[in-house]
Amino acid sequence: LNPDMASLRASVAAFRPFLEKDLRERHGIEPLAMYVYPAQVLFCKQPLTRLADLAGRRIRVSSTGQADFVEALGGTPLRIQFAQIPSNLEAGHTDCAITGSSSGHTLGLHRVTQHLYPFPVTWGLAIFGANKTAWERLPADLRQLLGRELPRLEERIWTAAESDTAQGLACSTGARGCKLPSKGRMTLHPLSSEDERLRLAILKTTVLPRWLQRCSMDCAQLWNSTLGAARGMALPER
């Protein structure tokens, strides 16, 4: 759904009003900020020039949505803990791993894989919130201070996540823009227009329909009134 940071910002802006209202009214949480982590990309041992090359490969994933995406490409998704990714790759239990571009480099995946595909399969998002009752008991001036400063912190985190995504790619491939002492020699394979079309097709035919099957509420209507409207992707409502 979000092939770049600009798309992710648009998606969050479309869904955030519902999310914040639901957190307050249903869960008693006052949402204060939303953070993002660097893009989740593909580290592979074998050459990877297009998404179709993932067919038949065993690929580490960290979410159900990622697993649906991999299965649609003909790959086998495997749930493996983050710290165990290198050993599984070295032992031949997995062929590729989907993880953060920055955290993957920190973990040393540039030492056990040779090919890097920078397509953001997913992004990690986190919410910073407070118990609503406790929040309302805070002094008004403190709430005003937090309400003013936390959005600034949020924006700095988003900017850092975009920078860290680029740094992870640069350092794993040994590009000149890398600012870290550890540099890899991975081959970077850019996203093609063919893969952009395939990404959208899988989202519409596999990832979204499976998500809709798992959802316990009328998610089609929610999707259509938020993300679907913003991104031009309507789902059939029940």
List each language-model region with its residue ranges.
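N-terminal secretory/targeting leader peptides
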Residues: 1-5, 24-238
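A gly/proline- and charged-residue-enriched helix-loop-helix capping module
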Residues: 2-23
